[in-house]
């Protein structure tokens, strides 16, 4: 278990993440706070100067120390007060798996009984290391090609549980911000829809980008969404991280089958919200559109030509060539799915149509599929509050029954 103890989660912050002054009966998890929240906690609860908060924040996020007694440049009296009213509570590592290609996956327990757990994935590459972080236990959406969707939904993760994934991974990797950086990028592409957990995700991303936290630049933190249009608009006013959109289809009819959220926010509205996002965040010059290729579903040449038209319209609206970038993702199978991965020939043919039209299109190399850590394969352990798990099991049983009868 790597020495990470699980303690029942308690809330000692307001909905905005501010510490509740004077509430020392319950310990404040300092991972729940960004720099501003930690400064307020030290001023209002501990009666200390703000620079003390900065000292502790560095101990937590630069040196991965969770025991106040080990924070040697913090006075003994202050350490004692911190022990009485605060803690650094991190997720518990249930197991970790290594892929043959270097990918690393952790199953992290969020509750004392380990019935709820999420998955976090580290993907090393030449000159970079990317951490794929989860935002929910399960997912409230029901995308038909995603393993997480089959698990149903339990709840949103807290800020501490989100940034705790980064803490666990960075500690394991021996990451040293500003020096020996093993973790160079974070993508909010794990379990869950990040924009359905807006406040906690935005607060966690602020710690990722803070020099007292993990020191990542805005462009190295990417949020991926299935297309919650109002929340994309809100994100544009509260953060300027890189934006990725799970598109997966070039027209509404097909996208509604793959991403049911499209019935509420169709492609035209989604693309308009992406235009507004770039208009507000002038530092960002592009949006990445993710497109999972499934055999015979969305990988035909006519789909590629439709996608070209959609991407060109976006570039034209932004008056920037290359404002739309396409990330082609070969489908990663999971038990019970009826989708199949497109052939390599079809994937390359699809990409060529985009490239010939001068649309930047990359094919994402599949990583970690031997440990079910590839895109779309994460599922964790979810105590489902919906009926989706049971419905998925019945679907599989019915399919197996038909196959046996045949």
From Swiss-Prot:
Which catalytic residues are annotated?
119, 375
Which cysteines pair up through disulfides? They are 132-375
The residues listed in the UniProt record as binding [4Fe-4S] cluster, with positions renumbered to this chain, are 139, 143, 146
Annotated compartments: Cytoplasm
Q: Which Pfam families match?
A: Radical_SAM, RlmN_N
* UniProt KW Transmembrane keyword: no
Query: GO biological process annotations for this chain's record?
Result: rRNA base methylation; tRNA methylation
The protein's UniProt keywords, in alphabetical order, are: 4Fe-4S, Cytoplasm, Disulfide bond, Iron, Iron-sulfur, Metal-binding, Methyltransferase, rRNA processing, S-adenosyl-L-methionine, Transferase, tRNA processing
What's the EC number here? 2.1.1.192
This protein's GO cellular component annotations are: cytoplasm
Q: Which GO terms describe its molecular function?
A: 4 iron, 4 sulfur cluster binding; metal ion binding; rRNA (adenine(2503)-C2-)-methyltransferase activity; rRNA binding; tRNA (adenine(37)-C2)-methyltransferase activity; tRNA binding
SUPFAM superfamilies, alphabetized: Radical SAM enzymes
Transmembrane region(s): none
Cofactor binding, per record: Binds 1 [4Fe-4S] cluster. The cluster is coordinated with 3 cysteines and an exchangeable S-adenosyl-L-methionine.
| Identification of the protein by name | Dual-specificity RNA methyltransferase RlmN
Q: Which organism is it from?
A: Xylella fastidiosa (strain 9a5c)
Traced from the root, the source organism's taxonomic lineage reads:
Bacteria, Pseudomonadati, Pseudomonadota, Gammaproteobacteria, Lysobacterales
* Gene symbol of the encoding locus: rlmN
